[in-house]
Amino acid sequence: MTVPATRNDLMIVNMGPHHPSMHGVLRLIVTLDGEDVIDCEPILGYLHRGMEKIAENRTIIQYLPYVTRWDYLATMFTEAITVNAPEELGNIQVPRRASYIRVIMLELSRIASHLLWLGPFMADIGAQTPFFYIFRERELLYDLFETATGMRMMHNFFRIGGVAADLPHGWIDKCLDFCDYFLPEVAEYQKLITRNPIFLERVEGVGFIAEEEAINWGLSGPMLRASGIPWDLRKVDHYECYDEFDWEVQWQKEGDSLARYLVRISEMIESVKIIQQALEGIPGGPYENLEARRFDRVRNIEWNDFEYRFISKKPSPTFELSKQELYVRVEAPKGELGIFLIGDNSVFPWRWKIRPPGLINLQILPQLVKRMKLADIMTILGSIDIIMGEVDR
């Protein structure tokens, strides 16, 4: 529904898909009455790659490299949900050490995602300096990822029943050093940004979402928590080993772009607290549990007296998905990332439905920008934090 216009000569403006402030290949058809936004229509699909259909023709391990292309700035979460679904379907237990390693990697990935949200968000509203500051910390994070997984991005590190490799020697000390270094840097961001009068002028009261509205639109993550609802799946669903750590859900009640900024800044501090506790208390033991399961089933996997499945363990171990269905979710940096999986007693999923947080959160954008100024569109869009790889899939 459009807003009533005050004049006859309305202007229609295309923002994107190639726009300096656009977060990926999103196109907005904006109807303007002078500087006031009358209507906004998002056009999606420029980055659609058929990820759900690809999943139906791949084993889980073969599919892992694809999922890192959804939200390519927080790839650990897409990997986590991809292995969590078959783990729950097959009731596979994850060793405690593997669970601790997963939590450490997930929280490091959350910090990296929030950092790369903060820099462009500030650049969108006219503050260029933080954009360069965040890359300083992000480089240190990517060095940690590269040391542990071999890749700076697209890590391909999670496996069914654990992780691909144990933490290398000296990595824990290096990660603890990063945590000690990073906390003062977050304090510096807050000192530079949070009480800056120009910043407050651009974000305070802009893009307001009420509590009931956030629930009705199905929002999740910082979008939901900034509207006064302390809902975090790490506390609600008790997955991995988050219950073993002392940390708080970060939320605000104002519901505007400033509140969403404050939630994400605070979440980075909480992530550091979780990482420090996990590093200091990480147990010994195996980092994956598939080996024992293979030996248990050795009688069933012989073919012409040749145990082919052992040979194929590293490139692509097969794992049959039983004939049942389930929904699995994790708390990604942008919100609730979920998978609806239907098995069919095959190594391939019968259905693999992705619930991307960015797509759901983006639905409220047209309502938020109506009656606002043209310049506020990028502030509001930036505060939502979308990655078009997961929106279009």
From Swiss-Prot:
Q: Which GO cellular component terms are attached?
A: chloroplast thylakoid membrane
For this protein, the record's PROSITE patterns field holds:
COMPLEX1_49K
Native organism: Amborella trichopoda
**Protein's UniProt keywords contain DNA repair:** no
Q: Catalysed reaction(s)?
A: a plastoquinone + NADH + (n+1) H(+)(in) = a plastoquinol + NAD(+) + n H(+)(out); a plastoquinone + NADPH + (n+1) H(+)(in) = a plastoquinol + NADP(+) + n H(+)(out)
* One Gene Ontology term from the biological process aspect of the record: photosynthesis, light reaction
The first-level EC class reads: translocase
- Coiled-coil stretches are none
Family that this chain belongs to: Belongs to the complex I 49 kDa subunit family.
Gene3D superfamilies, per database record: Cytochrome-c3 Hydrogenase, chain B
A molecular function GO annotation? oxidoreductase activity, acting on NAD(P)H, quinone or similar compound as acceptor
Main location per the UniProt record: plastid
The EC number on file is: 7.1.1.-
| InterPro entries, alphabetized | NADH_Q_OxRdtase_suD (IPR001135), NADH_UbQ_OxRdtase_49kDa_CS (IPR014029), NDH1_su_D/H (IPR022885), NiFe-Hase_large (IPR029014)
The answer to keyword Nucleus applying to this record is: no
The protein's UniProt keywords, in alphabetical order, are:
Chloroplast, Membrane, NAD, NADP, Plastid, Plastoquinone, Quinone, Thylakoid, Translocase, Transport
Cellular localization per UniProt: Plastid, Chloroplast thylakoid membrane
Subunit details for this protein? Answer: NDH is composed of at least 16 different subunits, 5 of which are encoded in the nucleus.
In Swiss-Prot or TrEMBL terms, this protein is called NAD(P)H-quinone oxidoreductase subunit H, chloroplastic
Relate the protein's function as given in its record: NDH shuttles electrons from NAD(P)H:plastoquinone, via FMN and iron-sulfur (Fe-S) centers, to quinones in the photosynthetic chain and possibly in a chloroplast respiratory chain. The immediate electron acceptor for the enzyme in this species is believed to be plastoquinone. Couples the redox reaction to proton translocation, and thus conserves the redox energy in a proton gradient.
The record lists the lineage as: Eukaryota, Viridiplantae, Streptophyta, Embryophyta, Tracheophyta
Q: How does it sit in the membrane?
A: Peripheral membrane protein
